[in-house]
UniProtKB/Swiss-Prot annotation:
Subcellular location field: Cytoplasm
Organism of derivation: Moorella thermoacetica (strain ATCC 39073 / JCM 9320)
Leading EC class: isomerase
Chain residues that bind ATP: 30-33, 51, 87-91, 414, 477-479, 493
Name the record gives this protein: Chaperonin GroEL 1
Any one cellular-component term (Gene Ontology): cytoplasm
Amino acid sequence: MAAKQLAFDVEARRALEKGVSTVAQAVKVTLGPKGRNVVLERKFGSPVITKDGVTVAKEIELKDPYENMGAQLCREVASKTNDVAGDGTTTATVLAQAIMLEGLKNVAAGANPIFVKKGIDRAVETVVDEIKKISIPVESKESIAHVASIAANEREIGELIADAMEKVGKDGVITVEESKGTATTVEVVEGMEFDRGYVSPYFVTNTEAMEAEFEEPYILIHEKKISAINDLLPLLEKVVRTGKPLVIIAEDIEGEALATLVVNKLRGTLNCAAVKAPGFGDRRKAMMEDIAILTGGTFLSEDLGVKLENVDLNMLGRAKKVKIAKEKTTIVEGYGKKEAVDGRIAQIKKQIEETDSDYDREKLQERLAKLAGGVAVIRVGAATETELKEKKHRVEDALAATRAAVEEGIVPGGGATLVHAIPAVEKIQAEGDEAVGVRIVRRALEEPLRQIAANAGLEGSVIVERVRSEQPGIGFDAVKEEYVDMIKAGIVDPAKVTRSALQNAASIASMLLTTEAIIAEIPKEEKAPAMPPGGGMDY
């Protein structure tokens, strides 16, 4: 085991503070509409230019192991806020630094860190209640576009996100991809789409697009392979009598079963197609159950104990339209009962809440979207690769912030909400060192607005005092450099972002205040390579 070095008390806290401040200094210049850029070196390719707090924070690694611990904790504030709310990383970093610096001053002067922490927690709770009280629900397309435009710093992106959300609903999946051209567009896949196509090209009905399209088909959803035609014949005869097409989704269709389907299709006896089931293992089973619920059919699994030859028409699913391409299948407007689909959606949402795995969560979100109404793809275009990366990042940020706004509503932006929460904090009854903790938060609430003003080249203290004296909801528009009603001016933040930023900042800062010792590995000294043995020079 490598030897460790230790630091205690004031020395420990000072080292951590230095690390936090280093990260905060780099991150906070990006805050606000007039935030400055940070350029990040890349070993390969062009440098990255960004205004995104969490990207800057993740780049920073310090040489001193103690200071690096502080830097990592500061990174944690930014990334945690980003994970929960998708935005507010810079605000969280500014708040964490403010709470920590004020707190360390007081602890060094003899305040008890435990009571200081208690005061900080009480003040944060009060501010969170204030945020919840004043938050305004986001429902209209226009207000969604507003929120997204602010997060992305661009109206066009805001409109695209609002467009995508309107089309796929609040639970729909919206993915961000790089476009081949320079334009940024939204593409919507309606209905349920999965990445499996027809088993044989003979099933194609539209030779130009190489797709099989069926109106109001019956859909057989079978867990196992189908190879014997005798199992399938009774069902085929029933479907032929109805004159409707048949789509078979199974693990695989092969041998004489496939040959018979192809022959019937070519003769015009039965319009049909076979598709392999999507996914693998347990996920395949779950996806096929989803398809069954969406189409109002029965998933014919082994557990059900129903043989293929005994399948009735009422066990088959139905849909308004099914489109099958070489590598994807889309089921539009399944005829499943709304209550059954809603029940399945609620079940998947519960699984999303309970899972710890990011991968599982992503896959569950995809399943949820497919049931809830579709998937939208925002294709981001730009003139250069550097611009493309930066723009794609902004779109992803704006998307997460917009989801947060739809979830918990919006509050006045630009740091105004935190400043207007100060009177509520001042009313808290606290004594001794607990009152010190409350005062620390009260002072920290001014910092985001102060920093926004500083980045715009103005005097922060003057602006903070002016906003404090105004009615709640009035804040400072750093672009126009005037005092406005923030909601009317469209300068808003998702309530979830403001709340998460404060809670995460206070959590890390108060943890640092109560730190009494830090342990790190002793850095290895790199020895200079030995000189090669000299042998004189050869000429």
